[in-house]
Amino acid sequence: MHNESVQDYILFAEMLCNGGVGVNGTRILQRETVDDMRTNRLQGEALEDFAKFGGWSKGGYGYGLGARTLMDREKNNALSENGEFGWDGARGCYVVVDPNVQVALFYAQQEAGSTWWDWHGTVRNMVYASIWADR
């Protein structure tokens, strides 16, 4: 992964965290679009199937407009708050966006065949543990 790609990913996550406004103050997405990303669209069996994806790493999450969204933190042992959203790539990249506490996390990895679902929750919880320890 090139350094520019990492920087772009981080800027994109920060923009989402700021409700669609980039770090330079320019509106890139409407707030409603970001809210749609955080609003679960799955019901019933589709929601149950989504929880099983990635080695059961999506328990407690639903799926909005192109992103997973945390609906029940206790089902995922998450230290983040409900409403946190993001996505993970097939080779292990991981994004967490949480406008409620102003967290934009990007974990970069490109490894075919990795079991990324084994550690994404740990990475997320380590970040949140450090945030909550400072409050």
Residue spans of the language-model regions?
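Catalytic loop of the DD-peptidase/beta-lactamase superfamily, centered on the K-T-G motif
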Residues: 1-135
